[in-house]
């Protein structure tokens, strides 16, 4: 009888705690709307030079920037090709524009685009080959975006 009473007491205590503690509000619309987006930066590490995958990531980054969040995109591996002024970028039917156009508007609207120097060299790109406003990433500078207070990191 003692074990059953102990079990029931534990169960009732658990239920009481479950209903006594307020629900988390990390993802409800009111909490997100009332947070200061400018204090919640996003760092996106982009690794794919594929036009459609790149467009999706850049479109997401630009939408996040438009919500007021500071956004920095680090283009590395073959994603550096997304910032090239010339060269083919396939435009699929679901894409409203090619990646370089999204990047240009993203920069114009205040977003930061960082490039991997060794990756550019690997693909034969120079700074003059890139759309205006792209910055070279470098040790210490790039990490400033990654480890900024409240920053979130996303790899695309």
Which residues make up each language-model segment?
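Single-pass membrane-anchoring alpha-helices
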Residues: 2-28
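Short internal beta-strands
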Residues: 61, 71-77, 114-117
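Short, glycine-rich nucleotide/cofactor-binding loops
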Residues: 37, 42-55, 83-88
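Loop/turn elements at helix/coil->beta-strand transitions in domains of secreted/extracellular proteins
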Residues: 39-42, 68-72, 109-112, 149-152
